[in-house]
């Protein structure tokens, strides 16, 4: 099952990246119904602009469906609790995908769909590492908890990034590290509470400028917290002079630097599509690298 799981992991990574491309090209409503497109299993003949967005959305659905089949097969053959949880998660992801369309890109649902994709990929990464890497480092429960908390921080930061994307707040601050010349601009904390209104289409965002600034800056401050926390933690891990810790830590460090630089470049270059997609891919790679480090640590004596 090792090779099978790795294939599923790469497929999940592709689904996450293509999902980001779908959001960033405003193709999320390219097909206004679900699971088909205008009532058809493939994109029907429509005007050129709608056709491109519709095909982007449907290819994303086809790829996600293929991943679901892989995960179902994995559950049938492994029968483990983790594979069962993964199978249930994929079913819930399919529902979120449907609601993303039927609820017209309501931000909490869009963010939940993004997080569900990341968690699916993360669980597949953990299973793949479990099949591939036997050697672990015995550490204290305190150190294990500290590294695990770093994983939780990454999860929250990905959620904030999803909130930025789903509320179209990426371009609201054109400078760095300030926002419109202010390090601490005016904030509107209602930006994190968006009730659902059946009469609204949320494509393009409905929040005012101050609310979007709030979302953007919270994501930035979250990035600072993640970088500082992980830099201090990695320095400590490197000082342990354990080869496995150093190798796993270097992967995290590279992914962290890469992701932070992509975030800054996206601000200065006005969010070109390839950099925006790369920023989402970078978040996925950072998550995988941190899960790898967590897996390599064992706080229980065997």
Locate the predicted segments by residue.
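Interfacial helix-loop-helix junctions of multi-pass membrane proteins
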Residues: 22-31, 94-114, 164-175, 212, ...
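A juxtamembrane structural motif centered on a specific transmembrane helix
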Residues: 126-143, 288-302
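Membrane-interface helix-loop-helix junctions at transmembrane boundaries of multi-pass membrane enzymes
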Residues: 76-84, 140-142, 234-252
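Extracytosolic (periplasmic/ER-lumenal) interhelical loops and adjacent juxtamembrane/interface segments
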Residues: 24-58, 170-212
């Amino acid at each position: 099952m090792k090779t099978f799981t790795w294939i599923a992991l790469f497929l999940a990574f592709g689904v996450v990246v293509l999902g980001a491309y779908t959001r960033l090209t405003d193709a999320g409503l390219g097909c206004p119904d679900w699971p088909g497109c205008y009532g058809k299993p493939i994109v029907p003949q429509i005007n050129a602009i709608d056709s491109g967005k519709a095909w982007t959305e449907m290819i994303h659905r086809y790829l996600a469906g293929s991943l679901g089949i892989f995960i179902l097969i994995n559950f049938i053959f492994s029968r483990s609790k983790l594979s069962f949880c993964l199978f249930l998660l994929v079913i819930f992801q399919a529902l979120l995908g449907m609601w993303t369309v039927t609820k017209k890109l309501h931000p909490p649902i869009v963010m939940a769909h993004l997080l569900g994709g990341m968690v699916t990929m993360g669980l597949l990464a953990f299973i793949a590492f479990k099949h591939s890497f036997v050697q672990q480092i015995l550490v204290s429960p305190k150190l294990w908890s500290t590294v695990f908390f770093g994983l939780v921080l990454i999860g929250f930061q990905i959620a904030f990034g999803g909130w930025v994307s789903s509320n179209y707040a990426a371009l609201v601050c054109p400078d760095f590290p300030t926002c419109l010349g202010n390090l601490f601009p005016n904030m509107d904390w209602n930006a994190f509470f968006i009730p659902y209104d059946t009469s609204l289409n949320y494509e393009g965002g409905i929040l005012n400028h101050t609310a979007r600034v709030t979302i953007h800056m919270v994501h930035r401050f979250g990035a600072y917290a993640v970088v500082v926390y992980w830099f201090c933690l990695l320095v400590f891990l490197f000082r342990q002079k354990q080869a496995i810790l150093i190798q796993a830590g270097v992967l995290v460090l590279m992914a962290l630097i890469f992701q932070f630089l992509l975030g800054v470049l996206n601000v200065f270059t006005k969010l070109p599509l390839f950099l925006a997609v790369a920023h989402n891919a970078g978040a996925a790679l950072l998550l995988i690298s941190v899960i790898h480090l967590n897996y390599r640590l064992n706080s229980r004596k065997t």
